[in-house]
């Protein structure tokens, strides 16, 4: 049986040493080094490369990391019962620069949290139950534990739930996506305007798969760039500048 949130809140996190490989060099990371005197968000998951972890759990924490940090969070840790090589390769493929991955290879931290569960029916051995927590100076202030039922529930340990607890009135930025063409001066102008306003964007550049036919099929237009914000088409460089002016 998993521990209750109430039984863990107000308690110190387990004092362990993680065998990590930052910069491809072995290094021991202690709980004190990660948590002492710091405000840290932790999310723990069953395994690197697994579907929910890769498609939703980690990417959303990475996306909301700047907002979490603007509300006093010093670091965001992803803990999993995997070795350092696996965790590093997973992070590299996830484009998750805002997240610190922590390999709990022997499960010592997870066991100390009471979250080590038997996943031998999947060939996983013992893994972490999915949860997230806010830790201040090594003490658990708030923890969100997924309901204990069959499968891999994902309802409360997500980044949005954590942000809502930490800063209920926080403004979550809409995702911004730009379809661009290499060498396009209007694309460069739109990108500079977004950067000048500290707006993060994802760029999809023209190549053999993303061409004018695709651009027209998605946007109904044939000129580059085309920028979307929160699923709505803003348009090209002039429209982006007008949209930014309207936000000022």
Predicted regions and their residues:
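Chalcogenol-based redox active-site neighborhoods
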Residues: 1-176, 181-212, 216-224, 233, ...
């Amino acid at each position: 049986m998993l521990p209750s949130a109430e039984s863990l809140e107000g308690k110190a996190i387990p004092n362990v040493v993680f065998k990590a490989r930052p910069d491809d060099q072995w290094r021991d990371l202690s709980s004190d080094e990660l948590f002492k005197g710091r405000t840290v968000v932790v999310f723990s998951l069953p395994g690197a490369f697994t579907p929910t972890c890769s498609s939703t759990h980690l990417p959303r924490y990475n996306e909301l990391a700047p907002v979490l940090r603007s509300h006093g969070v010093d670091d965001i840790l992803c803990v999993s019962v995997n070795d350092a090589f696996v965790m590093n390769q997973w992070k590299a493929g996830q484009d998750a620069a805002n997240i610190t991955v922590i390999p709990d290879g022997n499960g010592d931290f997870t066991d100390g949290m009471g979250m080590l569960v038997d996943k031998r029916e999947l060939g996983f051995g013992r893994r972490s139950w999915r949860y997230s927590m806010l830790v201040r100076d090594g003490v658990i202030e708030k923890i969100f534990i997924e309901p204990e039922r069959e499968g891999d529930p994902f309802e409360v340990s997500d980044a949005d739930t954590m942000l809502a607890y930490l800063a209920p009135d926080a403004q979550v930025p809409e995702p911004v996506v730009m379809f661009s063409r290499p060498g396009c001066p209007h694309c460069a102008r739109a990108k500079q305007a977004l950067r000048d306003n500290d707006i993060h964007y994802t760029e999809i550049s023209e190549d053999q798969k993303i061409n004018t036919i695709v651009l027209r099929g998605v946007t109904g237009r044939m000129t580059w760039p085309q920028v979307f914000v929160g699923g709505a088409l803003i348009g090209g460089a002039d429209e982006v500048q007008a949209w930014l002016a309207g936000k000022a």
